[in-house]
Amino acid sequence: MVKIYAPASIGNVSIGFDVLGAAVTPLDGTLLGDCVSIAASSHFSLHCHGRFVDSLPSTVQENIVYQCWQRFCEVTGRELAVEMVLEKNMPIGSGLGSSACSVVAALAALNRFAGEPLDAHRLLMLMGELEGRISGSVHYDNVAPCYLGGLQLMLEAQEIISQPVPCFDEWLWVMAYPGIKVSTAEARAILPPHYSRGDCVRHGRHLAGFIHACHTRQPSLAAALMQDVIAEPYRCGLLPGFADARRAAGELGALACGISGSGPTLFAVCDDLTAAQAVAQWLAQHYLQNEQGFVHICRLDSAGARQLG
């Protein structure tokens, strides 16, 4: 049997719309992500369980894990008779790369079970293709960090999909999911078709400056540049209480705060555990909207998708 865990991720990381993503893992050891197990069988079957299993499609054919199996068999020319089990621990429409978790775990498990017929580049391309069926377009800012780990910059040039960006080990990432759903497709549709020249210049300056600050080890500069002029001004209205949460996080010592992916999850960056705990406590008390919500203090997950057991 093969069992693969794929971690949650932050798409965009405020300054890198569709081109920057980061995998995260809670300090307390919680597996914040999906797991897919595969075992040999006489025929294909898919079973699902987990905290958020009720949010999955009602038919097997609509499930993205089934579609991963189907597409993997097409690409490799092999009809794999396997029993697949999806442990759906990630809320759908959360801004934590939920669909990427399922896709990455499923395809990485299939590839491992089949003897790794696809190299990492081809597998990542396939992950982007399958995740795009849910998000509405192919982009790698969730699947790349989920699969490869760490902070990843999407390049898609010279057959390079993404490359790692050095980040700061002292940074803690407070992740708060309020328990409501935001559709990625709807969150993309709310964005304007055109941006002003000033916003384009600011976006380029923030992203380039952030990458430069990461490579030159300037954490305060990197944090100061984490300002989103592309998505956050338009999406914040989809997140009840976001403006108050961002203001409170800053007052409690957060270096930066932004929307994770399309939301509604937000992240706050701290360089001190005491500040991170204070931010986490405030968010748990004021940002969560129901019992489905949660808050985790995380670090970047450098490992990405990995086999368990």
From Swiss-Prot:
Task: Give any GO molecular function from the UniProt entry.
Answer: ATP binding
Q: Name one GO biological process term.
A: threonine biosynthetic process
Organism domain of life: Bacteria
Catalysed reactions, as listed in the record? L-homoserine + ATP = O-phospho-L-homoserine + ADP + H(+)
List GO terms (cellular component aspect): cytoplasm
Q: Does the keyword Amino-acid biosynthesis apply?
A: yes
Q: Residues that bind ATP, according to the entry?
A: 91-101
Top class in the EC scheme: transferase
Which Gene3D superfamilies would you find in this protein's record?
3.30.230.10, GHMP kinase, C-terminal domain (3.30.70.890)
Coarsely, its chief localization is cytoplasm
Q: Where in the cell is it found?
A: Cytoplasm
Its annotated pathway?
Amino-acid biosynthesis; L-threonine biosynthesis; L-threonine from L-aspartate: step 4/5
Indicate yes or no for the key word Electron transport.
no
What Enzyme Commission number(s) apply to this enzyme? 2.7.1.39
Q: Which key words are in the record?
A: Amino-acid biosynthesis, ATP-binding, Cytoplasm, Kinase, Nucleotide-binding, Threonine biosynthesis, Transferase
Task: Summarize the protein's role.
Answer: Catalyzes the ATP-dependent phosphorylation of L-homoserine to L-homoserine phosphate.
What PANTHER family does the record tag this protein with?
HOMOSERINE KINASE, HOMOSERINE/4-DIPHOSPHOCYTIDYL-2-C-METHYL-D-ERYTHRITOL KINASE
Family per UniProt?
Belongs to the GHMP kinase family. Homoserine kinase subfamily.
Q: What is this protein called?
A: Homoserine kinase
Organism in which the protein naturally occurs: Edwardsiella ictaluri (strain 93-146)
